[in-house]
Amino acid sequence: MELYPGYLEDHFNIHKLSISSASPPEYMTSASTQFAAPVRMGAYDRPPPVGMWSHEQFKVDNGQATSASTIMEAEMKFENRLEEIPQVVLEEGRNVDQEASKPPDKVLRRLAQNREAARKSRLRKKAYIQQLETSRLKLAQLEQELQRARQQAVYANGSLREPNLGFTGPIDPGALGFEIKYSHWVDEQNRNTGELRNALLQGQTTDQDLELKLLVEAGLDNYNRLFEMKEEAANSDVFYIMSGMWKTPTERFFLWIGGFRPSEVLKNLRPQLEPLTDKQVVEVGGLQQTSMQVEDALSQGMDKLKQTIADSLTAADPFDSPEAYMVHMANAVEQLRSLVQFVTQADHLRQQTLQEMHRILTTRQAARGLLALGDYFQRFRALSSLWAARPRDSGIS
């Protein structure tokens, strides 16, 4: 085909050929068109000028294509980054909240160390208490063995056929257990007495009356525990309770059936309860009279029991057979079991007296009464200590 002159300079024909061509021009298949295709022109964007009469306008520079592809690639990465920002922010916020809700590792380690130290402290305290109780048991056992050795020395001129004279058998475990419990009870009573004294010195207010009420109830509960311990120990060794070996010498001097006389306590502590109303005076007087009557009845019962046991021992003929002798001794042993009931009834009288005084008196009066009672027993123990520490003549062992 013959081309007319200037055909190659006819830019319009070149443009027509490029438009009508079935395949896109070479510059349209470059890598830049793959990224330029999604680009859309905004409604208010000014279209780029296109020169139609200069072939330079259709000439694509490789550098420009590369830069355009780089720009489009950066824009797509930027859009992808924008889409990822909310999720990252949410995840970071969620992680921050979770971290804030969790204590730091240093705090957790410190808490674990504190728990371990507290556990070891409790174990040491428990071991110390067990060691203390064991030592107290050994001390009580040595004291009882010493007392029985003294009794054996007193009766050393007795029959050689009775080497155990002065001994009543092995030490009862129940008595030793009561010795430890009673020592703890004394500590608790001293603490309650001190708290009552401090509370009474602070004056009278609504809060103070409530505190006094709680202290009075705690003091009464402490005495109730003592009576329960004594009943349990009496079933194991009633003579241990009745003899007062668990008390100081001065307390044993005033002992009545293993404890204090309720009527004597009421008489000695009544001045500490003043002022009393007329009704309270009548009720306290009636309670004291009733206590004296029950005490007399129990004392008479004890005297009768002693006489009955003595009669059982003297009823046996020295020339009777061993079988007849054992029958009389068995009767005497059975009668001794009644001593447990006497101890229980005496403690019941003491308990009822304290409860009736609590009912008759006001909270403040009951607090003063328990304070006076605790101080009363403390002075007995202090008197025994002073007596034991008194100066002795060097010529007397």
Swiss-Prot record:
Residues 175-390 form the DOG1 domain. GO terms for biological process: defense response; DNA-templated transcription. Residues 132-146 are annotated as: Leucine-zipper. SMART domains: BRLZ. It is found in: Nucleus. GO terms for molecular function: DNA-binding transcription factor activity; sequence-specific DNA binding. GO terms for cellular component: nucleus. PROSITE patterns: BZIP, BZIP_BASIC, DOG1. The keyword Nucleus applies. It comes from the Eukaryota. Keywords: DNA-binding, Nucleus, Plant defense, Transcription, Transcription regulation. Residues 106-126 are annotated as: Basic motif. Transcriptional regulator involved in defense response. Belongs to the bZIP family. This is Transcription factor TGAL6. The gene is TGAL6.
